[in-house]
Amino acid sequence: MADKGTLYIISAPSGAGKTSLVAALVDKLAQVRISISHTTRAMRPGEKDGVNYHFTDRDCFVRQVEQGRFLEHAQVFGNLYGTSADWVAQTLRTGDDVILEIDWQGATQIRKQLPDSVSIFILPPSLEALAGRLRGRETDDETVIQQRLDGAQEEMSHYGEFDYLVVNDDFQRALYELEAIVEARRLVTARQVARQAATLQNLLARR
């Protein structure tokens, strides 16, 4: 029996620290890979195509939607985002876990298609902290920041649809909680049977 990886859906309002937490989680745990989304959003300073996102134009994105190339896709703040269906399926078959950093709309689509996926919502400790983090980025003007804050409350209203809830008040604590979720899922009997097949066979062999 082959060991198949687990698909993790991680959502959070913009500025909650999701990207930093996921990057730290991948650094700590083996066999965890981040799905790189396709987007029509403009590249920000310091970003690289194929590393942060697969940047594309709207026409190309729409063609891929029509071809069924995306596991999920959504429009956020006027930009289109999508997850490659082929890449996710191939990576899970290798036994690696996959993390999708997507909004609640995409999470809803994924859960319907893949009910075995595990969903996690990350909350900021307060709206004031969220606003401070968004302004601290120094990448958006005040109008955009206000739009993001308005969108954040809509996003956060869907927290109850997720399997796990993590509050990013203390970064290391939040990272520990994410790590605990992944490690616990790896100990589920169905996955352990695949990983520990030789051990189980030896233990239960007639002597």
Swiss-Prot record:
Q: Which reaction(s) does the protein catalyse, per the Swiss-Prot or TrEMBL entry? A: GMP + ATP = GDP + ADP
InterPro entries, per database record: GK/Ca_channel_bsu, Guanylate_kin-like_dom, Guanylate_kinase, Guanylate_kinase_CS, P-loop_NTPase
- Give a yes or no for keyword Cytoplasm in this entry: yes
Keyword field:
ATP-binding, Cytoplasm, Kinase, Nucleotide-binding, Transferase
A Pfam family that this protein carries is Guanylate_kin
Report the function annotation for this chain: Essential for recycling GMP and indirectly, cGMP.
Protein name, UniProt field: Guanylate kinase
Encoding gene (name): gmk
Signal peptide: which range, if any? none
A single cellular component GO annotation = cytosol
